[in-house]
Amino acid sequence: MSGQAAAAPVPSGIVVHAVSRVLELQYPGGECFRVPFELMRVYSPSAEVRGHGPGQETLQTGKREVSVTALEPVGNYALKPTFSDGHSTGIYSWALLYELATRQDALWREYFDKLKAAGVERDAPMPADSLPRGHHH
């Protein structure tokens, strides 16, 4: 998932559906997608989820009930959600949001395959050693 496409469409409308836990993205021309908060959270572009390079990713679990509690624009190119579990360091470019919206089936399969390979349940709590504690270099 690159999240970096030169011609990424910019949503013309964005709606946070708190009860159904989805972000609705409306695009010029009539396209409309509903991206589950859980999918957004497990594919967060933040360093604490993605790591600083290949193989450093942290598999996210226990995010099925996560909500978006705040949503801030980042310039004219991205959104920064704050999730109910306290995660707020992911900056979601228009390209990444469009990828999450249009590749949901494949991304869910990839996520479930990673869970299975790790022998972890989707709703398992995150291990204490992988919880965010700030950023250290």
Where are these regions (language model features)?
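Motif-centric detector for short Cys/His coordination patterns
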Residues: 1-137
